[in-house]
Amino acid sequence: IRLHKTNFKPYSKKKILKKIKLETKNSKLSINDGFEKMNKLVKLSKILVFTYPSTGFLEAIRSNVPCLMLWKNFDLEIDISAKKNFENLRKHEIIFTSEKKLSKKVNKIWNKIDLWWYEKNIQRNLRKFKNKYCNGKINLNKIYREINKIA
């Protein structure tokens, strides 16, 4: 699980990991504090879990790497022009606004992540999303700023 490198106070990495392991009953999870290179994490991971909207999430989608995202302030932060496309990822349980629902999803798919990720309906919806946000030569930082209403 990759945390934002500056945005998880007052909890330490250790406290967050303990809480997640208790809720998921999965001792194999690990926490990344946001400083490690993404390509190294991808090689070591069954699934990537993002705790905030980021270019890393878009890169994972673009590369077709199994991933989930927790976006607690989705309804407040999402730009109206992008909402429909991101709502579709929420509908297909790739984006979550609740830690508890995200945790349940991880538990449900843990032993069959590839089966879930490569299911036709999931891949079809990911393709639609990629065609809109992750196609060809793109500036992922620019897209991220547009989606999140950042000037």
Task: Report the location of each language-model feature.
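Short acidic alpha-helix that forms the nucleotide-activated donor recognition element
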Residues: 34-45, 62
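Short, well-ordered alpha-helical microsegments
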Residues: 9, 13, 38, 56-58
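C-terminal alpha-helical cap of glycosyltransferases
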Residues: 131-151
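Catalytic binding pocket for nucleotide-activated donors in carbohydrate/polymer assembly enzymes
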Residues: 18-26, 47, 52-133
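Catalytic donor nucleotide-activated moiety binding site of glycosyltransferases and closely related
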Residues: 1-34
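Residues at the C-termini of beta-strands that transition into short coil/loop
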Residues: 3-5, 33-35, 71, 97-100
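Gly/Ser/Thr-rich loops at beta-strand to alpha-helix junctions
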Residues: 7-8, 54-55, 136
